[in-house]
Amino acid sequence: MSESIDFYDFERLLDKAYEELPENVKSHKSRFEVPPAVVTIAGNRTIIENFVDIAEAMNRDPSHLLKFILREVATAGTLEGRRVILQGRFTPYLIANKLKKYLKEYVICPVCGSPDTKIIKRDRFYFLKCEACGAETPIQHL
């Protein structure tokens, strides 16, 4: 091997990689946290008081998250203001599990584990595009 080859040192390569990252990934200093669901059962209805806050923390459209929850618990429901009213009695534990499932399937990148993703449509297919690593993973359309 020739001695004249100029190899990048680790620090310069690291700086170059950091410059290539999107701004929202660079500025992501805090840990990704989704607020726990505030669930109230009133009669034969279940109310998720902070539903829009949860959707915003996941960086998802509340209507997409609502559609997922309604399919998972097989019921009807409506978005009223910042809360959701579901027909039927559902435990806070069940709601939390459904939110975790949504996170796993529609938010967290399966390649690098980053929450910095968005849902994109290409032709008839939907993909989870990671803004941190650039991976595109096909997802099921709701």
Curated annotation (Swiss-Prot):
Function: eIF-2 functions in the early steps of protein synthesis by forming a ternary complex with GTP and initiator tRNA.
Annotated family: Belongs to the eIF-2-beta/eIF-5 family.
The organism's place on the tree of life at top rank: Archaea
Entry GO MF terms: translation initiation factor activity
Lineage per the UniProt record: Archaea, Methanobacteriati, Methanobacteriota, Thermococci, Thermococcales
Name of the encoding gene: eif2b
Protein name in UniProt: Translation initiation factor 2 subunit beta
A Pfam short name: eIF-5_eIF-2B
Subunit structure: Heterotrimer composed of an alpha, a beta and a gamma chain.
Gene3D superfamilies according to UniProt: 3.30.30.170
SMART domains with a match to the protein in the record: eIF2B_5
NCBIfam families: aIF-2beta, PRK03988.1
This protein's UniProt keywords: Initiation factor, Protein biosynthesis
PANTHER family, per database record: EUKARYOTIC TRANSLATION INITIATION FACTOR (PTHR23001), EUKARYOTIC TRANSLATION INITIATION FACTOR 2 SUBUNIT 2 (PTHR23001:SF3)
